[in-house]
Curated annotation (Swiss-Prot):
Residue numbers binding Zn(2+) 1: 98, 100, 161
Record: residues binding substrate: 183
Family: Belongs to the metallo-beta-lactamase superfamily. Class-B beta-lactamase family.
Coiled-coil annotated residue ranges, if any: none
Binding site for Zn(2+) 2: 102, 180, 222
Organism: Elizabethkingia meningoseptica (Chryseobacterium meningosepticum)
Cofactor(s) needed: Zn(2+)
Designated name of the protein: Metallo-beta-lactamase type 2
Subunit structure: Monomer.
Species lineage: Bacteria, Pseudomonadati, Bacteroidota, Flavobacteriia, Flavobacteriales
Amino acid sequence: MLKKIKISLILALGLTSLQAFGQENPDVKIDKLKDNLYVYTTYNTFNGTKYAANAVYLVTDKGVVVIDCPWGEDKFKSFTDEIYKKHGKKVIMNIATHSHDDRAGGLEYFGKIGAKTYSTKMTDSILAKENKPRAQYTFDNNKSFKVGKSEFQVYYPGKGHTADNVVVWFPKEKVLVGGCIIKSADSKDLGYIGEAYVNDWTQSVHNIQQKFSGAQYVVAGHDDWKDQRSIQRTLDLINEYQQKQKASN
């Protein structure tokens, strides 16, 4: 009986420690995905509903590469502080996968802390029209990067969530960062489509499937990223939306 009590106490203390660790930084949740690649999740409210935004960062021998940014500028510093605390390395590069604030909103901040910032020329054009901070460097829709010993690729699949949405492929890890063109497996609808190209979206997702058929993990832009049925769910949601549009006409 005493042995059982001791085990229960150990488990309880362990759980408390884990919970406390998770609560050290309520602004950002970080999960190790594979090797030196981490998923970070932040939260914000849209139309009265709280959503999670997912992106990744890669720890290289030169420093940390951040894809996109925390959702909300109030989380930027705590995020980079957490990275330094966890890995002892600074953010040296930031890439925005489209022009919305949950992706490109950190370009100015990352630039100010000394990181090189990047976006596609298409994203840069949109940001310029909206008088928003822009990346220091721009590139055409597709580009391969090498940072130290690490490599990854930015790919433009076509229009979908926005005209400028790109995905990021990590070949060694076989991880695809889908951004907002890929909906989570638990999504109920396509979300914000004010700048979407729904009629192009299906083909763009098929382009992703064909090019990255060897992906072991696909990280959806919002909410649950662990359920790997996100690509099929995205296609289903597009079809459902189109069918409703046809029925209403």
